[in-house]
Structure formats: C-alpha cells, structure tokens
Amino acid sequence: MQSRVTAAVAALMMVMPAMTAAQQAADQGRFIDAPGHVLAHRDRIEPVNRMLSERFEQLLPGLMQETGIDMWLVLNREYAEDPVFFTLVPEPVFAARRTTMLIFHDRGEEGVDRLTVNRYPYGDPYESAWEGGNLDDQWLALGALIAERDPQRIGINVSRDWPVADGLTAALRDRLMEVLTPELQARVTSAEELVVRWLETRASSELATYPQIVSLARGVISEAFSSRVITPGATTTADVQWYIRQRFHELQLDPWFHPSVNVQRAGLECGKESPFCGTSGVIEPGDVLHTDVGVCYLRLCTDTQEMGYVARLGEETVPDSLGAALATGNRWQDHLTGSYVAGRTGNEILAATISACEAEDMICSTYTHPLGFFGHAPGPTIGMWDNQGPTPIRGDWPLYESTAFSIEGNVKVQIPEWDGQWIQIKLEQDAVFEGGTVSYIAGRQTEWHIVR
C-alpha cells in the first residue's frame, strides 16, 4: 500500500517544476496542449486527507481566533448535509450517517480539539467524544459536552448573506437550542465569517497541487479546440460541448456545470452594449470559438474560459486584429490583477479596474469570483456581469492572502477584417493571490487555439 501511495503522490507532483517556471514568465502565458496525469480514485485519498490535516493544523486555529469563535458546531443529517461538511471530513466519506456532529473547540495555546458526537466514529483526524446510543442520547451528549467546555462564542452555520454559511437546518437548530441552557443559548452566534475564511483560504499543499488541477481543464480545452475534434462545416458547437463533457468523464473528473461552446463570426451582430455575444450551430472556417468549463479534482475546483479560431483555407495563424484583440483581453487582466491589494474590498478592486480600463478607452466588463472547494466560492465578489457597480455584502468582503480566484470578464474590440464589427474576447483564468501578487495557477491564455 505504501508503494502505491508514494507512486501516486510522485505522479501528482511530477508536473510542478515546469508550471512554476511558466508562472515566472513576464506575461505568465502558457499553452497546454493536452491534460496530464489523473490519479485513480483510490490514490486520491492520501493527498486529499494530507491536505485536510494540513488545513486543520495550519489554518483552523488562526481562523477561529481571527473570527472570535471558540467553539464551532457543524451539524448534519444524512442527505441534508451542510455544504461545509464535505470540506471537513476525510476521504472516503460520501455522506453524513444518521445525525453527524462535528465540534471544533479552540483551546488557545493547546490548539483546536476536533471532536465527534456520532453513532459511528470517524477516527483520525477526529476524536470521538461520544458514540453509540439513540438519537436522544446523542443530543444530550452534545449539550453536556458544550456545557462542560463552557465556550464563550458558539458558532453555528446560519447566514442571511452567504449561502455556503447557511447549512444548518431549522430543525437541527431547534434541537440544538433545546439541549443548551439559557446562558449557553445566549452565546450562540453566526459562524459566517469563520465559514468564509475557512473556505476561501488555501493551504500551502493545496497551492502546490492546484496547478495540476487547472492544467487538466486547460488541456481538455486544447484538445477540443483542434482538428482532433472539429471538422469545419460539419462539427457543431453542441458536438464540442459534449466532447468536453465526455472527456472529463473519461478522465474521472467531476464537472460542476455543463460546458458551453459558442461562435462569433463576421456578419453575426455583436452589439457594443450587448452583455454577451455568440451563437450556436455548425462551426465554419473563420469562426471565433469560446468555451467555458469547470471541473473539481482532489476537492479543488476550476473555472476556465478560452478563445479559439477556425483557420480559413491557406491561413496558418489568426488575423492580426484578432491577435491584438486577445492582447487587449490580457491587458484587461493586467489592470484587474494589478488592482489586487490585500485589505481592499472586491468593490474597491472593481472600481480601480474600471478606472484603469477607462483611462485607455477600453471597453471591459469584470465579473471575477473566488475559487476553491466550490467553483463559485465565498470571498470578495469583484463585479457581476449585470452589475458593474458595487455589490452589497459580498463585494464589501476584503482581499486576504492565500486565496484563489477565477479572473473572469470580457473586452469588446472592433475587427477591421469584419468591416469594423465588434467582437467579444471572453476570458477566465484561475489565479492565486499570495505574497501580495497575483499568479496564474497554470498560466493564462496569451495565444489563440487554432483549428487548422
């Protein structure tokens, strides 16, 4: 078994040096022509559980102290789990069993105790505080445990503004309050800040692993936007969508939404004020392609959009104006990532990005979001496609270190070869904010995919 684990981890890490070198390039451009190695499900258990242990040891104590929660309760029932539950349990866990209670107690310098009050104990990395018995006994045991430990602020997952922090059902909350004394009831508070910080913060081992995960998604896009998949005049956008979906299935990767593919072409109107441009149908020579894909692997998710071009007969590369259009999209990315400053809110980053684009008469739209355990993760929202002004609550969240984002948005550019028609360059590349700098996790698209 040890040899299997060692081989699996080695296979997972073998692509890292090249990725690091690519990230050091000035523009961080990188072309990935095929997906890399994917671990078998059995071999994914060790790295996932190792990353979970690191998160518990390196992140959770500081986050609980930062948010002022000294006891965090994550209470679940089978098939009605709190969304946070799956980020807290070791592999291979598929669901809560009966009623599953996770308790985290910050004891200061002694660290955070990770406890369960369950019919079935989890074992490492949890200590069983109670097991067996019936449901009434289980709830009484939870109440007794809380009373014995006497926490000052008891965090529960209820939130009006953050969906992923609102996983405690009404029935479980009522049952909890029944087993607490009035004094302890008064100490119960929302754990929403702790939940957001737990979900948005990446451990060092996750940052080391993430490039491989993002490169898988980018590699499948390269396959899809090539003559291996597309025959101009015959292949449809739906064919490419389903190729991508099937390819993820073959690689045993979990998509978190169905891939989309669309085309823009000369003569198909793209209004200057249109929020999105593109249509579906048969792919023809001269078409501009766009796709949006997202997968999750080793519990970390990707969200990627890239552009392609279908060469006409005799063309070896894209028209110069399309090359310039993609460069404009990269310039918008630079304005956005250059506006990332720790402590700035999402709304402040958006305003700085818009100001920089307007100074260059660039028509841009920014709708960037955090990334991690979820494709649309909590953290600072930086614009919405239908709102380029401040976003209440989520846009007011500040930027922290060791957080990942999908750098998502678009620019509009006129194409002389298309009689001045507008074209939309829609990009989404995954990045991490670390050490005061934004680095693309597996590079970014700086050259077109070309179907020859």
Residue ranges: model-predicted function:
Residues 8-17:
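Bacterial N-terminal signal peptides
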Residues 1-9:
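Bacterial N-terminal signal peptides that target proteins for export
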Residues 18-22:
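Sec/Tat signal peptide C-region and signal peptidase I cleavage site
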Residues 23-452:
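Active-site neighborhoods and metal-handling regions in enzymes and metal-associated proteins
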